[in-house]
Amino acid sequence: MNKRLLIYPLLFSAGLLQARQKPNVVIIFTDDQGYQDLGCYDSPLIQTPSIDRMAKEGIKLTDFYVSSSVSSASRAGLLTGRLNTRNGVKGVFFPESEGMPAEEITLAEALKEQGYATGCFGKWHLGDLKGHLPTDQGFDYYYGIPYSNDMYIGPSQQFASNVTFREGYNLSKAKEDQEIVRTSSRADIKKRLNNASPLFEGDKIIEYPCDQSTTTRRYFDHAIDFIENNPEQPFFVYITPSMPHVPLFASEQFKGKSKRGLYGDVVEEIDWNVGRLLDYLDKKKLAENTLVIFASDNGPWLSFKEDGGSAEPLRGGKFSYYEGGVRVPCIIRWKGSIPTGVTSDAIIASIDLFPTIMHYAGCQSFKQKIDGINISSFLKNPSLRLRDEYVYVKGGEVHGIRKGDWVYLPKTGNSKFKKGDVPELFNLKQDIGESNNLHLQYPDKVKELQEVMKKYQSTSTMPYAQVRDTLNDDRQYWIQTLVKIADPVISNLSKDQLKKNIPVGRSSSALASSREFITHMEAVGRTIAGIAPWLELGPDNTPEGKLREKYIKMTCKALANSVNPKSNDYFNSTATRQILVNS
């Protein structure tokens, strides 16, 4: 599909245009790295001299926020400058699930229109199907694992003619893996394939399974080669290491070298490669015209304990909306253009990078709504405070608000709302660990922050995007798959419903529990109807079979009427979940 970038150039005077060269841009966006997991953020065990050097040569941000506490949604916010209430990405994508809407304009597309060479190296996680890969979203070149490094091959992914097979694989065995993925539950896939992830170049697999002990170095190698091979254009290089997301892999050079186990080895290897890149920019005399940004996509995966990171002194981590889930390390370096050795507590967000970088590239006006703000004046003068509030978005919905030192979380910062949870109000200046809930002591402050939240809620325009265009062409395939995988309860209740002329799609993992499920659905506005075993939502003493049967009967009935929001049986996922919890 041809997209038209609705971006208008700044009207510079001729003299200013000649005097100012468009800067190169490098963004390094690590995966699941915690707030404390750098030397310059007070890690007691992990040594990161190269990133610490960046902090000495630039600005370290202590209050930098990403748009989500999970990967896909966070990356969508970074690359679009838009909150997840707008950009259509609510959760995490799995192989061959939905991708970010093709209509979204990425930073790569916008910079490409301004004459930039654009390359993506590492984890993408915004869709691996045709129309959603990096090379479909503005990048000239892509090299990496297209989603998390614990995910598997997609059934329809194509192999390059020069593909390298490892660990006893050949084309026939690789296609067997694709068939396993096509016909098995997610739990069975992970058990049988054991994190056999594909490495892509462009839109095809070039290595399977990927040797993950060497990916970090290879990502940076290819990024440096890309810069070397594009001397005539300004460049945008987006380096997205697949780690320290689990499973963890370190090369022999770094394995066992840190004081923080394998997790520390992985972070120190990333740091060493950051140093190689900085040295290259310095050696090639590119540093004074290259904006380099280092950040993490969300907080650490704490449930993995020693294989997860640390968000200390913040509370929470990945999946949560306490500070440790969405506040991450961020360092910005631009030699000769911004101050050095500065630590700032200004509230800055990943969505601010899009309008800021586009300002430097010569554009600042967009027809699509951009939620980020241009922080170029702050980068010149870090004493400025350009915003005093930031909204937390979970699953495409406004989940909380920070204003000044205050944070209000009406449904708590937990990843799942439990019976008995109460709203939370914290003062970060007095309580950075969010341990003292003040919502009863300060009712006026709660009301004030509720009003601020309403402002963001009223502008929410989540598109019909989490579900791909209805898959009528694949209808029989999905029906057969549903019947094959689903247990007898689902199959029997579904047979009559499958005869109806209901469009077929695949569910978003944003709605999924830890169990794999296939669903046929119709999306209307922002509501999705589907068949799925929401077993974890019921009371502990509810027999799983009874709960599942009740849910499926309710959903099947609603599914037939889902095209009519005014129907009494119109399916609303939130309402249905509540019925189950109270049953």
PLM feature segments, named:
Residues 163, 462-465:
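N-terminal pre-domain segments of enzymes
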Residues 217-228, 275, 483, 487, ...:
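Amphipathic, non-transmembrane alpha-helical secondary structure
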Residues 2-6, 17-424, 428-455:
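Formylglycine-dependent sulfatase
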Residues 466-523, 553-558:
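Low-complexity, Ser/Thr/Pro/Gly-enriched N-terminal "stalk/linker" regions
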Residues 30, 55-59, 486, 490, ...:
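Short amphipathic alpha-helical segments enriched in leucine
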Residues 282-286, 364-367, 472-476, 534-552:
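Structural helix-adjacent loops and short alpha-helical linkers that scaffold large soluble proteins
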Residues 512-583:
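Membrane helical hairpin/interfacial module
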